[in-house]
């Protein structure tokens, strides 16, 4: 039986469609993502916590879902908005269609709405709070009340909500078409010990580190610098994550202590913003953020353009950079800051999401640079 669904934005705009997920309601900040593929990775990316994701590509669900493509152990997106759900999921890796997957994870979703209109509205007015209600006779008044009551992401610390509860080891490399997901590697085959802070880490980013010889100790977001330094890491990785970096004072203080050492530090997304804050810069909330797999970014050092995956609603304010932070990357969409490098320490960061799968691989050299810094640190420490 087909059930109705309704999306209402905080400005009162309504979109009527049909429910393709769980019955109930979902409230969050409505954003749009321009990726053509990777919807399962998007749904399970912890960076989308408290967000309702609109996918601009018209056909979503063509290839179904499978366990190997999950970026974390659960769906983190608050809700899903799409134009059309295909009747058939066709792929040799498919184990469950998208609608069944959403229902199993209790995710409210709506289809058959004008996603182009919604995206243009969000671009013009900025990201808005919204509410999806799915079921018999959705109540528009109730949806509007819930949308207006949502506090928004500004000032909200979600990293400590999505982080791991316990420290764990990670030694699995990346998926390949020939062999699929590999078995975990022996730690004897991984010469570099990297401590990875989980602010909402994606599995594929961890896999890219393992591909380059790193054995990972993944720690909760609120782990102290003293605990990490006792682990004698060769490098420290600051992961991606959701929401506003400014309230994460525990992470900022830990990073400040790492910057008093010569241990290499590499930050991605939220980790990039936290490194900037720990170095004395400031961050700002963006109008509608960057969400997609086709964002051009200029590498200022190499004078080349990279196509990158992006997922962030906050950015580092370039005007606030102290003298010891050098700009390395800038967005060619809006000129916002995309990368920094400390001039006095082996620490650098990138705003986008270097991807193992399914996104672009242009930013992979950033991982290679991290390994170069680790090798130099190890040789200098001897």
From Swiss-Prot:
L-glutamine binds at residues 47, 241, 270, 273, 311, 313-314. One of its GO terms (biological process) is L-arginine biosynthetic process. It holds the Pfam family CPSase_sm_chain. Coiled coil: none annotated. SMART domains: CPSase_sm_chain. It is an enzyme of class 6 (ligase). The active site is at 269 (nucleophile), 353, 355. Pathway: Amino-acid biosynthesis; L-arginine biosynthesis; carbamoyl phosphate from bicarbonate: step 1/1; Pyrimidine metabolism; UMP biosynthesis via de novo pathway; (S)-dihydroorotate from bicarbonate: step 1/3. Disulfide bonds: none annotated. It comes from the Bacteria. It catalyses: hydrogencarbonate + L-glutamine + 2 ATP + H2O = carbamoyl phosphate + L-glutamate + 2 ADP + phosphate + 2 H(+). Its EC number is 6.3.5.5. One of its GO terms (molecular function) is glutaminase activity. Residues 1-189 are annotated as: CPSase. Composed of two chains; the small (or glutamine) chain promotes the hydrolysis of glutamine to ammonia, which is used by the large (or ammonia) chain to synthesize carbamoyl phosphate. Tetramer of heterodimers (alpha,beta)4. Belongs to the CarA family. This is Carbamoyl phosphate synthase small chain. It comes from Salmonella typhi.
